[in-house]
Every structure is written in structure tokens, then in C-alpha cells.
Amino acid sequence: MSERATYAARRVLPDAPLLAAAEGRTPGRRPVWFMRQAGRSLPEYREIRSGIGMLESCFDPALVCEITMQPVRRHGVDAAILFSDIVVPLKAAGIDLDIVAGTGPVVANPVRSIADVAALPRLVPEEVGAVAQAVQLLTAELGSTPLIGFAGAPFTLASYLVEGGPSRNHERTKALMHSDPRTWHALLGTLADTTITFLQTQLRAGVDAIQLFDSWAGALSLAEYREFVLPHSERVFAEVESAKVPRIHFGVGTGELLGAMGEAGADVVGVDWRIPLDVAARRVGPGKALQGNLDPAVLFAGPAAVEKQVRRITAEADAALAAGATGHIFNLGHGVLPDTDPGALTALVELVHSL
């Protein structure tokens, strides 16, 4: 994967607040969007997804377009994020997995040996052609709103493959990385290739930014992250650098890893709700924008509590900017919870824009 991809001209969105903040320019307003904004919190999403499986939905370009647009229409957020799932490129490549309701991704044949790694199918762009088509539909419909593409980071994909599904302790994953580093790095190298192909496909189709989700990285120590994960995430960001779009890096529970995550090459580092943004800025170091970081559960506490926390976060973000951060994108510290009142999200967007 050493060759740098070439990308056709994409939309020019000089006034988009999200792109301005991500690129270190001054936005016309503080940008805000939400991870998992297209999802079960919206009644229109539940209606359109009725009877259609998650993975089936992700390979239907018209459905992906409609679901991605729903929160943009309803909330007035400053970005759309492509409706997909981090295991989509694995499924597209031919890995036997499914998303089981109430559980998450379940892998039929977990990866536990170098032979298992060698047997993994490699993703080719044509296998995610439906995703590219969805991106093209969206860029034609979104007007001046940027579209964020995304992929799962190699470590998080590896954890699903090694564990066979979601894991609380990641014991098999950690056992493999420590006991058999050769197999571990071969696996992450293969998954980095998959992630790169998936992101490059989205970039060629016209996404305006990308986010790399390392959902499970918070399970790692800093030493583990640096030795076993950072080189592979670093390669992903390097391989999409030539697209010249903002690159966002996010993980949950990664307060102690923020400095290393910042080194991976992203322009924006996502921060969960456990660490103040001004503290995060010192850990990440100057020259990066920050994204975050309202606790999703606060949205259940009522308008007064939400406003109090939003004002605290924006003040901490302003302190982060004074400390060397190059921008702030307001977001939650993780995804929108399924039972969140959509009206609370709309009000949150209006509040952030008013400050």
C-alpha cells in the first residue's frame, strides 16, 4: 500500500464551519455534529430501517443517502457522517460476520494464528462500490454541508476478529499481541490495508473529511498503544494525507493516549467526556484541533443541565485554543444514545451555535 492514491477534484466549501475549524481557520460559528447522529434516536430512522438488517442497509446506496441526510435536515448539524458500520469493509471483503441485534458484530471464524491472518481476504475497491455510490448521491444533495467518511482503526477491527465479537476485557486480543507479536503485526498490517482501501474509496467518491474510529483503544496502556497500535494507525493517516482533507482520530477512554494519538497524523483529535478539553490540548500538544466532548448521558438531564455543561465545555475549548489547539468542533464524547430525545439534540445544536 505504499503508492499514494490520486483523487479527483472535490466540492469546494470555503465557508463550512467544520472544515474551517479542522483546518485551523476561524469558523463563522462553532461547528457541531454528533457521532451516531443518524441512528435509533430518530423516529424516521427507525421507520425506514424497519425489517432491514444493519449490514443490508449499509450496502443500499439510496438508503444510506436518506439515513445520512435525516439528522442534517432535522438538527441543522454542521456535517453529515456517512451511515455505515466499522465492520462493513470486513464483510465486503468476504469475512463471515454478521451484526447481531443486542450483541454487535459476531465473527464466525476468529483469527488466532498466522495461518488465520494469511487466509483473510483482502478488500478491493469494487467490493465497496455501493458505499462510493452513496457518497456520490450525498455530495449531490448536501449543498454546503460537509460529508465525513469513516472507517474503523486497525486495532478495533483486530479486536473484533480475534475475540469473535465485542469484548469487555479484550483478553484474547492482548494475549495475541504480547505472546505472538509477529502474528499481531501481520494482522494489523492486513487490517490497515483494508482501512486504507475503504477510506480511499470514500475519498475518491468525494467525502470532505474522514474520521478513524478506534473504539476499543481505551483498553490499552500507553506502552501497548505505542508498540502494537500506533505504527499501523500512523500508516493509515499517511496513506490518505494526499487527499488534503481533514483527518479526525477518535477513541473512547483514551485520555492517557491522547499524546500518542495526536502523533498518528490526524488534524483533529476527538476527546471523550472524561477529560477537560484544555487538559486534552496540553496532552495532544499544539497544532491540532480538538473535537468533543459532552457526555451523551447529560442529554437526559434536561435543558438547564445541558446548557450548564455546554457552557463549561465551550469555556474549556476556548482555553484549549489559547493553549495552542487550532480549532474546536463540538460533539459528544461518544455516540448518541438510542433513547435520546431528538428535540434535545436539535436544541443542543441551536445552543452551540448561539454561543
From Swiss-Prot:
Protein's cellular compartments: Cytoplasm
UniProt: substrate binding residues: 36-40, 85, 160, 215, 334
Site positions for Transition state stabilizer: 85
Gene3D superfamilies, per database record: 3.20.20.210
Alphabetized SUPFAM superfamilies for the sequence: UROD/MetE-like (SSF51726)
InterPro entries the UniProt entry points to: UROD/MetE-like_sf (IPR038071), Uroporphyrinogen_deCO2ase_HemE (IPR006361), Uroporphyrinogen_deCOase (IPR000257)
Gene Ontology CC terms: cytosol
Keywords from the named record: Cytoplasm, Decarboxylase, Lyase, Porphyrin biosynthesis
Database matches in PROSITE patterns: UROD_1, UROD_2
Protein's UniProt keywords contain Cytoplasm: yes
E.C. no: 4.1.1.37
Catalytic activity: uroporphyrinogen III + 4 H(+) = coproporphyrinogen III + 4 CO2
Domain of life: Bacteria
Molecular-function GO terms, alphabetical: uroporphyrinogen decarboxylase activity
Similarity section: Belongs to the uroporphyrinogen decarboxylase family.
Role, per record: Catalyzes the decarboxylation of four acetate groups of uroporphyrinogen-III to yield coproporphyrinogen-III.
Subunit structure: Homodimer.
Name of the molecule in the record: Uroporphyrinogen decarboxylase
Species name: Rhodococcus jostii (strain RHA1)
